[in-house]
Amino acid sequence: MTTVIQHPLVDHRMTYMRDVATQPKLFRELVSEITTFLAYEALRGIKTEEVTVQTPLAKTTGRKVAEHVVLVPILRAGMGMLDAMLRVLPYAKVGVLGMQRNEETAEPIPYYAKVPPVKGDELAIAIDPMFATGGSAVDAVAQLKKARANHARFLKRRGGTGRRPFRRFPSQKPAND
């Protein structure tokens, strides 16, 4: 599943993030804030379960996340989004995928994969802010399938180069999600 965020607060941050005058510290803060917005939207349908908790006054019911999550940033750019994702999902397991772009063909070349085994009921989320042609997304989902992920999502920020960012990905997304 691909979630595209259209929100004025994200657009505002993207403008400053793209500005060549933005200092590295502010850039990292903006990436973190945008990732938090992306995470909230991408996880809107995450499975929850009802639980009973004791408040200072009485017992009450609430909801807790029932779905186990594996976060898989694509090296290196996806690492900048990982801390924000872990603030939203502190219990998530983490793996990494390494890919580089073939400059002649623009195809991704995988060079590293360290993904924990994904159980059938776990949600695997690939994280990558760079999304030009969709090639790395297709390859990331293929790597997650190798780790036995039944449910995979790809989290990215919109607005990279302005070139057809979803050219390949929609036709090759996982059949089950």
Regions picked out by a protein language model, each given a short descriptive name:
Residues 1-177:
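PRPP-associated nucleotide enzymes
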